[in-house]
Amino acid sequence: MMILGNLRVATLSDGYGLIPDAAILIEGGRIQWVGPEAHLPPSAAPRHDMGGRLCTPALIDCHTHAVFAGTRAAEFEMRLKGASYAEVAAAGGGIVSTVMATRAAGADELLAASLPRIDAMLAGGVGTVEIKSGYGLDIETELRMLRVARRIGELRKVRVRTSFLGAHAVPPDHRGRPDAYLAEVVLPALKVAQDEGLVDAVDGFCEGIAFSPAQIAHLFAQAHKLRLPVKLHAEQLSNLGGAALAARHDALSADHLEYLDAEGVAALAAAGTVAVLLPGAFYALRETQAPPVAALRAAGVPMAVATDLNPGTSPLGALGLAMNMACTLFRLTPEEALAGTTIHAARALGLSDTGRIAPGFRADLAIWEAEHPAELSWRIGPAPLHARLHEGEFV
C-alpha cells in the first residue's frame, strides 16, 4: 500500500479529468482512491511526495509489429531515390526481406533484437503494448514471434497483448494462392497459437495487395469459433469495405483508415469499434489522404493512436511523437491524443481495467515533468517521463 501525493492527476474520466493538488491511494496493484489530497481518507500507508508533477495513466501502444529481425534501411534509401514499390520488391526489399530475416532468426536472437525497442517504449511512459506476429508467414515462425512477445512480458515490467497476424501478406511460397495459404498455414497456426495461450486477438490486412474481404471474413469466422476477438488493418491504401467488415464482426478495432468512407464511419459507430490512427505510417509513406477525423469525431467513434512500429512503413518507436503527429497531421486535439493512447487504446485491446485513473483500475501510472497534459502531445523529442508505476510498483 502507498500514497502518491502532491500531484496533478489527469484521470481521463471526463476529458482530461484534471484534479489539482491530488493524491492516489494504491493497494494490491490497484487504485483504491483518487481525489483532492485534502479529502484523502485516513491511512497509515507511506506517502511519496511527487513534487506537483503531472500523473496520467501509463500510455498504451495498441498497434505494433515490435518483434522482427533485420532492418529496411537500404529500402528507405531506394525509395528516397525514387524507386517504386515494385522495384524495391524486385531488389529483394519489401515485407519479404523482413520475413526472410525473421524466419532465419532463432528465438533468442529475435528476443535480443526486440527488447531494445520495448525498452525505448517504456522510457516514453508506455505500460501496455500490443505486439503482432505476421513476419513469419509460416507456422513455425509465426508461433516463435508470439512466444517471444509473451517472453517480453515476463522479462519487462510491461503488459503485453498479442495479436495473431498470419494474414499479413501472402509469402513467396504461396504466391498467387492466398486461399491455400490461409488453409495450409494461417488457420493451423492460429489453432496451435490458441491452444498454447499465445494469442489475445486475431488481426488481418484487408487490401488489394493482401487479402480480400471474403478471405478476411473466413478468417474472422474461424477466430470466433475459437472465441478470439478480432481487429483489422483496413482502408489504408484503398477502400474495400474493410472497416464495415470489421464492424460486422464486432471487431475491437479497425486500424489505419485513410480511405474510410461515410458508410465505414457509420458502421464503426454502430458497432462501437475503435478507430486506431497510425500517423507514423502516413508520414513514412508520404501519404496525402488522411483519415476522416472530423467525421469520426462527429459520429462518436472512439479514436486511438499508436506507433505501428514496424521496419518497413513506420519505424517509429516513440508513442509521444505519434501523439504529436496525430495532432499536427490528423488534427486531433491533445486531449484526444491522450485519450487515444490511454482509455481508447485500452478499449482497442479489449481491456477494461486500465487507461484511466479510477478506483479498481490497475495502478499502471506515468509521472511526468510537465504541468499540463497537453505538453505530452506538444513536445517533440525525449519524453518528459519522471517515473513509471507498473501494478503499483515504481520501475
UniProtKB/Swiss-Prot annotation:
Its main location: cytoplasm. It is found in: Cytoplasm. This is Imidazolonepropionase. Its EC number is 3.5.2.7. Binds 1 zinc or iron ion per subunit. 4-imidazolone-5-propanoate binds at residues 72, 135, 168, 236, 313. The keyword Transcription does not apply. Keywords: Cytoplasm, Histidine metabolism, Hydrolase, Iron, Metal-binding, Zinc. It is an enzyme of class 3 (hydrolase). Fe(3+) binds at residues 63, 65, 233, 308. Catalyzes the hydrolytic cleavage of the carbon-nitrogen bond in imidazolone-5-propanoate to yield N-formimidoyl-L-glutamate. It is the third step in the universal histidine degradation pathway. One of its GO terms (biological process) is L-histidine catabolic process to glutamate and formate. Pathway: Amino-acid degradation; L-histidine degradation into L-glutamate; N-formimidoyl-L-glutamate from L-histidine: step 3/3. Zn(2+) binds at residues 63, 65, 233, 308. It catalyses: 4-imidazolone-5-propanoate + H2O = N-formimidoyl-L-glutamate. Belongs to the metallo-dependent hydrolases superfamily. HutI family. NCBIfam families: hutI.
